[in-house]
Amino acid sequence: MIGRLVGKLAENHPPFVLLDVNGVGYEVEVPLSALGYLPKLGESCSLFTHFVVREDAQLLYGFIRREDRELFRLLLKVNGVGPKMAVAILSHMSPNEFVECVRGDNLTRLTKMPGVGKKTAERLLIEMRDRIKDWGAGDRETATPELLSQAVGGHSHLEEAEAALLALGYKPQEASRAINAVNKDGMGRDELIRLALKGMVKTK
């Protein structure tokens, strides 16, 4: 089991990053909510990881905080929820927000995420209720805008932001509309993604 990787951030192509650990490159899929916490290319990066072995592939999922990985693993225990959906959930809300959603039986918010239908959302509420009952939501770290990284330069940040939304399961028209709705001069890729996701959940 690979539980943690520490190395240099070699590539950043949401939702995937490439971590160079002593000359070995590890491709890791991360929730889009983690983008703002990643360092600049070439700088040191540490990720808590979850290793998945399938017949056709070996996959690594990375998380900035231990509690993100903890919730990811709890989500995988829910019937019908695989790694892709678990990453999508963590891309849209923090562990604290998800816990509040389950405790408040907020079915509507769950169904606003791509790939989460009513039946899946109902299973999440039912099966996760007992699993998160001891989750100390108030004591865990919460993401804040001040922690977000500086904007990534270059003309392709719009395309990269749109590609990240497509990877979550949104349709091209939805992704393009959401990006254009929040885009402003000087805005970086990570902020674009964060605001677009926030807007899509509110308006969907």
From Swiss-Prot:
Q: Which GO terms describe its cellular component?
A: cytoplasm; Holliday junction helicase complex; Holliday junction resolvase complex
Give the region (Flexible linker) as residue ranges: 144-152
- Keyword Ribonucleoprotein assigned to the entry: answer is no
Major localization class:
cytoplasm
CDD domains of this UniProt entry? UBA_RuvA_C
Keyword terms, alphabetized: Cytoplasm, DNA damage, DNA recombination, DNA repair, DNA-binding
Question: Some GO term, biological process aspect, for this entry: which one?
Answer: DNA recombination
Report a single Gene Ontology molecular function.
four-way junction helicase activity
Region annotation (Domain II) ranges = 65-143
Protein's name in the database: Holliday junction branch migration complex subunit RuvA
What organism is recorded for this protein? Hahella chejuensis (strain KCTC 2396)
Q: Which gene encodes it?
A: ruvA
